[in-house]
């Protein structure tokens, strides 16, 4: 059984050939595809794909770190509204920190990451963590959750194997 833990097949680049992509995935042995949200502009498209492929595609809700900007509070409010009114989401993601492209909103990325971790605990959902060039900050944010029921997986992890081992000591996570 193969599980795709992270796919953005709802973006417009896949619109034309999405049925063929899904067919190829199923023929290749993929049993499930988990789809992390990016920001408020992608929620409807993501949910539409998941509804078109029930039992195969599963939605996640979250605010991607590269989408964190001066309007992050409004974006978080949208995420929280979906979390508090719908039980269709299987995880909170894609969340985390990305310092590869830009560090302008680092403080805000950290606040957004922390808030979404708290929601994961509140709603009993795993998290999908985007960690690009941000190990030290990710570790500082996650270390206080060492003895909590927080679970999740790391995506786009650019750290070393030693850093990955350190993160895995925090709790039930996969890199």
Positions of predicted regions on the chain:
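Mid-domain alpha/beta scaffold segments of enzyme catalytic cores
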Residues: 1-172
């Amino acid at each position: 059984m193969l599980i795709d833990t992270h796919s953005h097949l709802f973006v417009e680049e896949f619109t034309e050939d999405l049925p063929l992509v899904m067919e190829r995935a199923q023929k290749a042995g993929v049993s499930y595809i988990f789809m992390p949200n990016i920001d408020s502009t992608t929620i409807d498209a993501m949910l539409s794909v998941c509804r078109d492929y029930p039992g195969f595609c599963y939605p996640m809700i979250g605010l991607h770190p590269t989408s964190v900007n001066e309007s992050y509070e409004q974006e978080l409010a949208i995420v929280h509204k979906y979390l508090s009114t719908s039980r269709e989401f299987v995880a909170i993601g894609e969340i985390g920190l990305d310092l590869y492209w830009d560090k302008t909103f680092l403080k805000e990325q950290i606040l957004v990451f922390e808030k979404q971790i708290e929601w994961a605990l509140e709603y009993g959902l795993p998290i999908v963590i985007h960690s690009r060039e941000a190990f030290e900050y990710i570790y500082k944010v996650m270390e206080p959750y060492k003895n909590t029921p927080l679970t999740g997986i790391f995506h786009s992890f650019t750290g070393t194997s030693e850093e990955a081992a350190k993160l895995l000591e925090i709790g039930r996570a996969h890199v």
